[in-house]
C-alpha cells in the first residue's frame, strides 16, 4: 500500500526536500524537525491581549509579520481563519495549534503566544486555551508541515513544560524553554 500526503492525494516519496529554509533544506522522510529552526524569539508574544478567537489569529499573524516583514498579515489571518472553519485547532489542555499553508512561502515559519487569562478557542476538551502555537507552511510542504505539527503536539503534551511556559515572563525566556525542551531526546 502506498503512503499518501495528509490529503490522501499525492504519493509520498523518500527524498530530500530542498529549499532556502533551514527547516526544510535537509529534512528527509525520517528526519526529525526542530522547532528552533522555524520559531524565532521575535515571533513570540509573552502576554497576548486577544480575547476572542479572531483576535488571537490576528495577533499571532501580526507577530509573525513583525518577525518576517516580507509576509502579508491579511493573507496569514485568512489562511488561519480558513483552517479554523474546518474545525478548531484547539487540541486541549490549554493548547491550540492554528496552522495553514500559504502560496509563495519558501519556508516553514511559526509564532507562539501566551494568553495569561486564557480564552475560549473551541478546544476539544472545552477548557480555556492559553498557549497558541501558529504554524504557516509553504503550499506543497506536507511532509515537513505534518512533522512540525506532530513535534509541537508532542512537546506540549507535557504538563510540567506547559506550566513552565506559563510562568516564563518574557519572549526570550519562553523561546529558551521551548528550545531546551525540544532538544531532549
What are these regions (language model features)?
Residues 2-185:
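Cytosolic covalent-transfer regions centered on His/Cys nucleophiles
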